[in-house]
Design a protein with these regions (language model features):
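Intrinsically disordered, low-complexity non-transmembrane regions of multi-pass membrane transporters
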Residues: 1-19, 25, 71, 75, ...
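N-terminal alpha-helical transmembrane segments of multi-pass membrane transport
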Residues: 1-74
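Alpha-helical membrane segments and immediately flanking helix-loop junctions
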Residues: 88, 96-102, 117-127, 131, ...
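Membrane-embedded hairpin module used as a gating/binding unit in multi-pass transport
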Residues: 175-251
């Protein structure tokens, strides 16, 4: 009888109920809210769903992220091994290759001025950097946090790992991906506030056709130029352009399909669950997390506003040939930001088609965010 009682007592105390804190329960609720947003509202479900599930798992069973040095038998938790691939900057680079394989740089090649709009939208990154310094973060932490302003989750993870800010990786990644999914909610009010209805109705001319040779040369030239100037950007820009070269060369269709489909989705699963698993209650529920979330929102708003304002400047310079709305697409949330530009423009004039024009600044923003990350790495002497 004593044996049965002891066994039952051990079983009961092995349940998670006796090992969780109020913080764990709060994070479980947050994870369930994220799952609801991903499934019911379809807010970036490909990313938000695995992130939310990783968050759920680590707050029920913390040992799923057990560090190998803390393990009594020398074996780490399952998601710990996934997380190492984030820390080693492997996952973000593979994500960039997949993005490159899915991206058409034709609108950017057809209208090189789009680079300026993509660059203008990076203002949010540097606004967040100085804001983070003012809030008491050190230089490297501020740099890692600031990339949220580019609405680029993989680059945020990449830079946080390279700068040794792994303790902040969870809040940074969750904030970055959350704001990426909230692009359709955050951007329109800013865009409408900074533009007149007349400006939103501006119709832009047809983009010129882009030859196959131009599309093949573009990733090669960008890789050479950017990597020579900022070698630290090679892992991100190089993988982005390699994926695009797969696509545009037309001779490696199998590699294009693999990079843009099977490999991409495998990496998203591993990246999402491991990032979510960094959000344990003890790591996530603190003042720094609130600061990071606030800074991310401010940075994203600043980046959107800077893009729109520069778009207005280009509108004046071209005597009304540029719709300022495409400037907001300069953040690197591809293709969500470009779709928002199209949607807001269509609300003013249903016959206005801005999507392809907005894709230029949008893909330029991807390159711009990677360059900003490389700049921070160069400044801090990290390779």
């Amino acid at each position: 009888m004593d044996y049965i009682v002891t066994t039952l007592d051990n079983l009961i105390h092995q349940t998670a109920f006796f090992n969780l804190t109020w913080g764990n329960y709060l994070m479980i609720v947050v994870a369930c809210v994220f799952l609801y947003l991903a499934i019911a509202k379809e807010f970036e479900p490909l990313l938000l769903l695995p992130i939310a599930f990783g968050m759920l798992l680590v707050n029920i069973y913390p040992d799923i992220m057990l560090h190998i040095e803390d393990s009594p038998n020398g074996t780490g938790g399952l998601l710990y091994y996934f997380y190492l691939l984030d820390e080693w900057a492997i996952m973000p680079s593979l994500i960039f290759m997949g993005v490159g394989a899915m991206t058409d740089f034709g609108p950017l090649i057809a209208n090189p001025k789009s680079f300026l709009l993509g660059a203008a939208a990076q203002f949010g990154i540097f606004a967040a950097y100085f804001g983070a310094i003012a809030m008491g973060f050190n230089d490297k932490a501020a740099a890692a946090i600031s990339i949220i302003g580019g609405a680029d989750g993989p680059t945020s993870i990449f830079l946080a790992g390279k700068l040794g800010q792994t303790a902040l990786l969870g809040p940074i990644a969750v904030a970055a991906y959350s704001y990426m999914s909230l692009v359709p909610i955050i951007q329109p009010p800013i865009m409408k506030l900074l533009t007149t209805e007349k400006e939103r109705k501006i119709k832009m001319g047809q983009l010129r056709p882009v030859s196959k040779l131009e599309k093949i040369l573009f990733p090669i030239i960008v890789t050479i130029v950017v990597s020579l100037i900022l070698p630290t950007t090679a892992p991100l820009v190089g993988m982005l352009m390699l994926g695009n070269l797969f696509r545009e060369s037309g001779v490696v269709r199998q590699l294009t399909d693999t990079a843009s489909n099977a490999l991409m989705y495998i990496v998203v699963i591993l990246l999402g669950t491991s990032v979510g698993a960094t959000t344990s209650a003890e790591a996530f529920l603190n003042l720094d997390t609130l600061k990071i979330v606030a800074l991310g929102l401010i940075a994203f708003a600043f980046g959107t506003a800077a893009g729109v304002l520069f778009g207005k400047l280009m509108c004046v310079a071209t005597k009304g040939k540029v719709n300022p709305l495409i400037g907001s697409a300069g953040v690197s949330a591809v293709p969500m930001a470009a779709r928002v530009s199209q949607k807001v423009g269509a609300e003013a004039d249903p016959t206005n088609f801005l999507l392809m024009h907005a894709m230029g600044p949008n893909v330029a923003g991807v390159i711009g965010t990677a360059v900003a990350a490389g700049t921070f790495m160069a400044v801090f002497g990290v390779f």
